[in-house]
Amino acid sequence: MIDAIKALNSDPSVDVITVLSKPSSEAIQVKVNSVLRSLDKPVVVLYLGDTPEYTEENIFHAYTLEETAIAALQKSKGEEVSFEPSIKEDVTANFNDKQVGIRGFYSGGTLATEAAMLIKHATGEESAEDEAFVYKSEHHQIIDLGDDMYTQGTPHPMIDPANRLKALESAASDDEIAVVLLDNVLGYGSHKNMAAQLAPAIEKFLAAKKSAGQEVVVLATVVGTDKDVQGYDSQRRILEGAGAVICDTNDQMVRTALNLIGEKVDQPVREVKSFDKTNEDLTVADSLKDLISGELSVINIGLEGFTEALIDQEVDYVQFNWRPSAGGNEELMKVLQFLNHYEGDI
């Protein structure tokens, strides 16, 4: 990350540097902040999962992904950072006394982590230690179905909807559910039409709940742009047609879910602090400069679908078809490794 920051700092076409980090240790944050304070360019930084207590004149410390994006845009225009979170206020539901839970079935860890953070900060419910969940409290569950434990021998959920379809099917029998959260991430490498895959499952889930006499709300957010091959607007329309309420961002989606169950998460109040400018070595290796600005040649190992982006960008590539042995099961891989090198009699 630090090398990338230095490279962006040296690029004259870059006006604002935006840094996104998954949950990190304090020592890592101290090191990264030291580098950021040595830059002259304005910076927006997000240490996802943390509640920022301060911001700086040249470095804006953000709380959520949406705030990060808006802050970066505002800084690029020379404006003061001003962000007000939003909810979908026209969404209502008549939940019964048992329906108090939020369930998030995410295809990736970043949005899942943000959802977990917002729900925890709003409700105060601590998460149990369970590797199957990003967050599992008394009433709420957030799952990253893109985690390694869910993708052993199977494609990532941004490519294959199977695990999320199963999750929605199982959720139909969960009487505690009030709100379901879904993301649909567009772009190269993702499913060509994920919304069409999720739509029947959403319709079936809502119908099952209606038959059981329960109102539930399915919230969905489409992550992408109108330039993505899947079609941003069409993906939103398909999900909305299936009965999902479409939110513009994950931040808005989670806050809307919290509002539906009578909870709210407050934006952190940040004072402006001053720190001495640091004197970090900002030298950028020539190899990194070449990687960023030079022409690429790529070896693509695995899914051939990833080469579509390379073809569209007219990048030279070589495709190498490969998949892990034993479906990625580490124990079976060790057995196969042993047998492949065993020279005795069996």
Predicted region positions:
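Catalytic-core regions of core metabolic enzymes
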Residues: 1-281
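Acidic/polar, glycine-rich intrinsically disordered N-terminal extensions of enzymes
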Residues: 275-346
